[in-house]
Swiss-Prot record:
Name the UniProt record assigns to this protein: Uncharacterized protein IRC9
Lipid bilayer topology: Multi-pass membrane protein
GO biological process terms held by the UniProt record: mitotic recombination; replication-born double-strand break repair via sister chromatid exchange
Places the protein is found: Membrane
Gene null: resulting phenotype: Displays increased levels of spontaneous RAD52 foci in proliferating diploid cells.
Extra facts: Partially overlaps YAK1.
Chief location bin: membrane
Residue spans crossing the bilayer: 25-45, 50-70, 105-125
Coiled-coil zones: none
Keywords: Membrane, Transmembrane, Transmembrane helix
């Protein structure tokens, strides 16, 4: 009876650690997005265009996700959803990087696509944490 309780506690600890790891990755992924959105809003209120120097934020996001997917739970989830991974993390970021370089990110069409990209990131992170 004691071994079963110890095994159950051990399993709960492992589940908690995986959840904490996924939550930490979610926070790390969210920080560049918060900075990106805040800088976009501040610059659009001031009537200025976003400079090319701020585009590495998107590249940083992609690098962080690529590093983060090496975790077992995240890699397992993404390997089951290859099409979602390709749609979310391959098509949209390069489209935005191109738009960002041409200073078109404040265009309404580009901003709507950016919001769709954010929603897809949140959906993918939620699937990973569940």
């Amino acid at each position: 009876m004691t071994m079963q309780k110890a095994s159950k506690v051990n399993m709960e600890v492992r589940t908690t650690l995986v959840t904490m790891q996924a939550t930490t990755m979610s926070i790390i992924l969210a920080l560049p997005l918060v900075v990106l959105i805040a800088s976009t809003l501040v610059l659009s209120v001031k009537g200025r265009r976003i400079h090319l120097a701020t585009s590495p934020i998107i590249l940083l996001l992609l690098i962080l996700f690529k590093k983060g997917q090496q975790a077992r739970s995240i890699n397992f989830t993404l390997s089951k959803n290859k099409s979602l991974f390709c749609l979310t993390f391959l098509n949209y970021p390069f489209h935005f990087i191109t738009a960002w370089c041409h200073n078109d990110i404040l265009n309404k069409y580009e901003f709507c696509l950016f919001l769709i990209f954010l929603i897809r990131i949140v959906i993918t992170i939620n699937k990973v944490t569940l």
